[in-house]
């Protein structure tokens, strides 16, 4: 302590060296003191070596490498989701198909049989089939959160998301929605500001999810010619990439517009404490996954099941005895009599669907969708695919009476390619095909997501608004696409 006092005394007395009459007195004094402080500082400051976790933070929050590392993490996560979720999803799908067939064979023929085998069981299956994706996604998100890395991601993304009316925490739900909007919407609970969370929920379905892939691949193969740009870039792959990019741009622009429309006095502030990096507590990870699955099954599942039964009823019944009469007429046709049992069943299903309530609704909306290049058959697919976007392909298979499951996609593509309008022109052209793809980029064609949005917002107001503005966007951009390419 005596040594420090002597140092301080010398430091003060050293100021007396300077002549106050000197015009540069103050500058010299400041420079001298700065040098003196720099000389004395090492004796007061204790330097410690960087810990391994601190070295990792230099990477995680780096202005450039932090973003690249995050993209790599996302790539690994979605590779796992797409690679491994498909196996249990296929098993769940085949199990519920078996249960539907078992119920159909075991129960007496009639309304109850059809309700259970074609409405209730497929509806429950429509809930359970999403569980593998939800479980895997929240498993990885829980790990990222438990380790402390997720807080770093939120920190680096906030500067990009905030001008759009979003929050750094919005990045996880939006990226999650590229796999499935359902877990994406559910993961917005980490966003504390109501306005930012609501905007994230409203734009999440605009991110192209995996359910859109069957629609995209069928239509791209149908209307986009095979070939390469610059000798190595696949044209069909380029169109697929463009559709994903269109969805992302649409989501971000919509977020900015909603930021200006939705009023909220509370300003969004990102208050974030970066926790220490650590190994995850697996018990907490498992609890998080189970909790998310439970919320989805018991809350959203009830609504999904109800809508499934409604869609089944509308597709199975029609006004008066039109279905019965049309079925009898087709059974008398020469084509029907010469067909195999599978072909006969497909033809009857096609005629029943055409004259059902949904078929009549498809014909009713035909004048509205005709400017987009669609006919009533596409209208039926648009309506039925509200249950889930991937239902689009199955609906077309039923409408066009494609019966051989082993070659379903090839036969469906060939049948659609040969489909003609009343004036003899092809139904599926580059203009109508691209218009349909753009429609699916923006349209809210997923009742499961609607159910989850209702659950998360605690109101039907926002799901209805979401369906409305996404429907308007889908119609407007599909119309623009058709007019440009016609």
Regions found by a protein language model. Name each.
Residues 60-155:
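Core alpha-helical transmembrane segments of integral membrane proteins
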Residues 26-30, 41-54, 104-113, 274-287, ...:
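Short, membrane-interfacial amphipathic segments enriched in basic
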Residues 213-239, 294, 448-459, 478-486:
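Transmembrane helix-loop junctions at the membrane interface of multipass transporters and ion channels
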Residues 1-47, 330-336, 341, 407-418:
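Alpha-helical transmembrane helix bundles of large polytopic membrane transport and channel proteins
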Residues 94, 98-102, 106, 151-179, ...:
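Juxtamembrane inter-helical linkers in multi-pass membrane proteins
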Residues 236-254:
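Alpha-helical transmembrane segments
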Residues 88-120, 124, 164, 185-198, ...:
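Extended, low-charge hydrophobic alpha-helical regions
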